[in-house]
Amino acid sequence: MFRLIQSIPSPKAEPFKLWMAQTAKERLDEMQDPELTIQRSMMEYKALGYSDNWINQRLKSIEIRKELTDEWKRCGLEEGAQFATLTDIIYQTWADKTTKEYKRFKGLKKENLRDNMTNKELVLNMLAELSTKEISETNNPESFNEHVDVARRGGSIARDARIRLEEETGQAVISPLNAKEVLRLEQNKDKSNKEQ
């Protein structure tokens, strides 16, 4: 593709060629040093207005999710329908909502659900996914039904923590707030803190 675009002699194509060359260089650099990918992700989240605390939580959640999907691959599960089904079971167990219901609750359409979770939701989702991975490594499930059971057990650990936190604080953990609303609230909070 790059060679094809390079062969276009138009001066109007020059800025696009330069952009493509820069992007290709960045991706090749990231392949050599994966930390650059993390830094780029942090800068992109920062540009969208996310707080440093939320960004750190989100990057950790990406790492934990990858560990879980690596475990599922090790067990012979296939990406796509099986991963989606198990993810739905984990969400349904700890949050009482499937992925689709959770996204609807937050007013999302195509946006990434995890990018629209609050810190508490991210932490509990990480607990559910980490617990599922640990139980899977310990029990070595073989059939898909055994994986379903493991996903429920992992989600139950986070569900118990969610219920306990809600009892202690008197506040619901599952929030209808999406990223735009959370960012707006954080900005208003920062303004009021500066005024004091």
List where the protein language model places each region:
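Positively charged, phosphate-engaging catalytic surfaces used for nucleic-acid and nucleotide handling
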Residues: 1, 6-196
